[in-house]
């Protein structure tokens, strides 16, 4: 077995460009993106550049032109990752790019049409098609989960309470995980499809000027696949692979999307998390960085293993071809170009402590043992006559009685139980036909038959319950070699056919690429051989023009990077200004209602909870109304005997009946202590001044 094998893998980056939509075509926008699938290059022309400026060129592992098929995208992008997770690796596939560039279409597609399905539904058919081809002695357990990150809050899309926020935790043996995230065991691709449909109904979407169904949250669909097979040491080994498929919300500019109100707040959170993702990518590529800011957002923390950790990762950068999206397209391509240099250290997860498959196998063995032992304890006289052993003596009425202590316990099969029931029925019938028995003996024998029958029924019920438990667990395990595709069989055939066509096409492209390289080399060799000074001057001029073009391209690249840096700075400054306004508003409200000395007390006992991203107050469960509900009023005198502090007049929270505290008469007209900041003469003036201050902040 390849257990524990590992290697350094760079993050694979592919680029996909969508076609111009009807709105862009109607407004007369032109495409500024040119893609060469054979060379894997993307060229972007600046619509505002002076004449003669060359287009910017980027090279990636794979590029997909606007006419690319969904099956081709899956086979070249996701198929190697899915094959790896079946072998026990972790894998991540995520779509990155500006809003409205087709990230959700790439990841999900149109699931009602087989040829338009995206990466996530195609992976369902791929996984169960692979299981169907495995050997019979291999066992599989597949479970799925679905979550979203909305406004920096993690929510379970498959949970009952969609308002419940989940905590992100971390353990040395498990890594980063989401506490209380629900996971469902599936047996076929149709189960996965139904679960995904359920989760999509709960996902946050909204309309903007750039996308009518814009994703307002980051969604992560996770498939956990456990397999158990025999190793070289003749022992069962469990390998666990996890596949995270991430549909990111797109970066937005308020001037283009027209977002206001709640949509603007969502866009701010989305941009902040994507900015953190960009910072993580930059820090991983920059060898000088000593700190990677994974914890700055929930998204990067959940993707910690996928970026520079134990995972095989593919990033699909989605871009738009329209000229008015030039800046966003260049920014996306630059981030994607950096991500190519991220190195991951993927290894097979063999025999992890939290594997459910091993627990299920142990439980199955235990249930089988209980079923085999469930009939023990019944006397042999309850079994068929041909299997009786021990001495017998004749009782009154001719009914045989057993001598105790000489009969071994037996394991009962369903056939033996049926024979025992038949024998009891026959003895009941024989008892009814006996006319010469004493009534007392008849009742004794009847009670004995009832006892035996009740014990038999109890054994049958116990076996039924155990069998139901056993069947329920066995249904969760999938045996290799069993075809579970059902309706998805057509999809698997479509994927395999597309994969074969893709291999043939790639082989042709590779041969053509080699031929073009050879011709290019021949041309360069010919140019190097000059027959005269005039030819040499002509050749040098061509080289000079080529170098000059490269110089102009580099200058243009520097200018674009400076402009992009300026735009990012302006966006960050705008976020800072927005947060500052919210902070000043919060501080104004706090200062208006909480005296300064109590603010200092709160600050002294407050701490930051990294897991949920909130400030928490220590011992808050033992304050206020929580204590008022628990403390009886009758204990007032008893509590005063211990000299407790008089907190009855602390900031209008406690009254004569609250917490059994001693009431100290107020000084003056008001019932609250004086504060260092003083108090306005009237409440109306206080409210008016606060309202005017709030209005000034919100303007």
From Swiss-Prot:
GO terms for biological process: anterograde axonal transport; cilium assembly. SMART domains: KISc. GO terms for cellular component: axon cytoplasm; cytoplasm; kinesin complex; microtubule. Residues 400-411 have a biased composition (Basic residues). The N-terminus is blocked. Residues 667-679 have a biased composition (Polar residues). Pfam families: Kinesin. The keyword Nucleus does not apply. Residues 620-699 are annotated as: Globular. Residues 10-342 form the Kinesin motor domain. It comes from the Eukaryota. It is found in: Cytoplasm, Cytoskeleton. ATP binds at residues 97-104. Belongs to the TRAFAC class myosin-kinesin ATPase superfamily. Kinesin family. Kinesin II subfamily. This is Kinesin-II 85 kDa subunit. The gene is KRP85.
């Amino acid at each position: 077995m390849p257990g524990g094998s590992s290697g350094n893998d760079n993050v694979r980056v592919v680029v996909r460009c969508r076609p111009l939509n009807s709105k862009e075509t109607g407004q007369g926008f032109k495409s500024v993106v040119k893609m060469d699938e054979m060379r894997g290059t993307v060229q972007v022309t600046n619509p505002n550049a002076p004449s003669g400026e060359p287009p910017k060129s980027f090279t990636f592992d794979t590029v997909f032109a606007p006419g690319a098929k969904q099956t081709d995208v899956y086979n070249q992008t996701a198929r190697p990752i899915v094959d790896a997770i079946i072998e026990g690796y972790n894998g991540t596939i995520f779509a990155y790019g500006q809003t409205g560039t087709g990230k959700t279409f790439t990841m999900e597609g149109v699931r009602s049409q087989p040829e338009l399905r995206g990466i996530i539904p195609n992976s369902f058919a791929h996984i169960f098609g692979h299981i169907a081809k495995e050997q019979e002695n291999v066992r599989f357990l597949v479970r799925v989960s679905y979550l979203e990150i909305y406004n920096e809050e993690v929510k379970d899309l498959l949970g009952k309470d969609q308002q419940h926020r989940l905590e992100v935790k971390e353990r040395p043996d498990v890594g980063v995980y989401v506490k209380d995230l629900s996971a469902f065991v599936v047996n076929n691709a149709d189960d996965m499809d139904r679960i995904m449909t359920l989760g999509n109904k709960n996902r946050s979407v909204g309309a903007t000027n750039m996308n009518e169904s814009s994703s307002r949250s980051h969604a992560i669909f996770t498939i956990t696949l456990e397999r158990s097979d025999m190793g070289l040491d003749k022992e069962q080994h469990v390998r666990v692979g996890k596949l995270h498929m991430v549909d990111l919300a797109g970066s937005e500019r308020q001037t283009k999307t027209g977002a206001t109100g709640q949509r603007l707040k969502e866009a701010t959170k989305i941009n902040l998390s994507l900015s953190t993702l960009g910072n993580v990518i930059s820090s991983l590529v920059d060898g000088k960085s000593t700190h990677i800011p994974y914890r700055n957002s929930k998204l990067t923390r959940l993707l910690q293993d996928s970026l520079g950790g134990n995972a095989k990762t593919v990033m699909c950068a989605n871009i738009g071809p329209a000229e008015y999206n030039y800046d966003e397209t260049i920014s996306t391509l630059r981030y994607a170009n950096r991500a190519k240099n991220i190195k991951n250290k993927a290894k097979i997860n063999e025999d992890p402590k939290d594997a459910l498959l091993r627990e299920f196998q142990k439980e199955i063995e235990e249930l089988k043992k209980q079923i085999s032992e469930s009939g023990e304890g019944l006397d042999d006289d309850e079994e068929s006559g041909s299997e009786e052993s021990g001495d017998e003596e004749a009782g009154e009425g001719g009914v045989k009685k057993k001598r105790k202590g000489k009969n071994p316990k037996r394991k009962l099969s369903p056939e033996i139980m049926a024979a025992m029931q038949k024998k009891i029925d026959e003895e009941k019938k024989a008892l009814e036909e006996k006319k010469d028995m004493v009534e007392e003996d008849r009742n004794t024998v009847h009670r004995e038959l009832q006892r035996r029958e009740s014990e038999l029924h109890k054994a049958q019920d116990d076996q039924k319950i155990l069998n139901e438990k056993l069947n329920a667990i066995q249904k969760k395990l999938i045996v290799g070699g069993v075809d579970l595709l059902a309706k998805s069989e057509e999809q698997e055939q479509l994927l395999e056919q597309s994969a074969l066509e893709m291999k043939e096409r790639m082989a042709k492209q590779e041969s053509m690429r080699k031929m073009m390289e050879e011709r290019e080399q021949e041309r360069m060799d010919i140019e190097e051989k000059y027959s005269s000074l005039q030819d040499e001057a002509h050749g040098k001029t061509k080289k000079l023009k080529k170098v000059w073009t490269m110089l102009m391209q580099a200058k243009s690249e520097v200018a674009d990077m400076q402009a992009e840096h300026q735009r990012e700075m302006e966006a960050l400054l705008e976020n800072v200004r927005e947060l500052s306004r919210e902070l000043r508003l919060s501080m104004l409200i706090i200062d208006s209602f909480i005296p300064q000395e109590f603010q200092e007390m709160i600050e002294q006992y407050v701490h930051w909870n990294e897991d949920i991203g909130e400030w928490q107050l220590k011992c808050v469960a033992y304050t206020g109304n929580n204590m008022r509900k628990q403390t009886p009023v009758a204990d007032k005198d008893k509590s005063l005997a211990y000299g407790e502090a008089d907190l009855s007049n602390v900031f209008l929270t406690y009254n004569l009946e609250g917490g059994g505290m001693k009431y100290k008469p107020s000084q003056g007209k008001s019932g609250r202590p004086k504060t260092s900041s003083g108090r306005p003469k009237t409440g109306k003036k206080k409210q008016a001044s606060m309202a005017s201050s709030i209005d000034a902040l919100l303007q």
